[in-house]
Amino acid sequence: MSNPFSLEGKVALVTGANTGLGQGIALALAEAGADIAAAGIQAPTETEEKVKALGRRFVAIEANLISIEPVQRILDETLAGLGRLDILVNNAGLIRRTDAVDFSEQDWDDVMNVNLKSAFFMSQAAGRHFITQGSGKIINIASMLSFQGGIRVPSYTASKSGIAGITRLLANEWGSKGVTANAIAPGYMATDNTAQLRADQDRNKSILDRIPAARWGVPADLGGAAVFLASSASDYVNGAIIPVDGGWLAR
């Protein structure tokens, strides 16, 4: 019997895969059998070494998704380097922390451009390819703030609420064409983006006190959800926003 979770012969494009959540997702997909294209502003040297150590092919694409200018080039370089594309993971993200009363237009635009605008246009470019080939998996990275308001991160909250919305929209439009669009909503993860929170003793304690798992998540915690949504095991899952949060939203 074939393994519905196998990604053998598949190619996944992961944005922002040089570190943190993107790296964890890329490695999980590679462990399941996928070859990996990684697009980002920094060279994903460590990710490349780890993926190749698993016996998978790897293509690194330098691109800054604060604008949509490199979107088509990212797709073209993926296809040129690996010959196909089956899975898109829109992981590249940015966060800026300031009280709403003081939040700047520049910070608003930067976060929205990376987190929402580029994610949509990456999905559009990949979606055209997926529709032509009759299959494809889009995995967006949402957030607990796709469900909640948060504090001091107005553009991040807006962008992640938007990610949930466009995930459902793409599922509605492309589901009949063999393309699924789903999202993973990570909880509090121990990454560079949360270093400031973890360094604040009181804030760190208040967060941990609410998480039933009683710990911060790590990038590898997203691996199972990513492999599921990338594989044929999830072919009838579409438009879902799946929390991976240690139980945070259950409280």
Predicted regions and their residues:
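Conserved glycine-rich cofactor-binding loop
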Residues: 11, 18-20
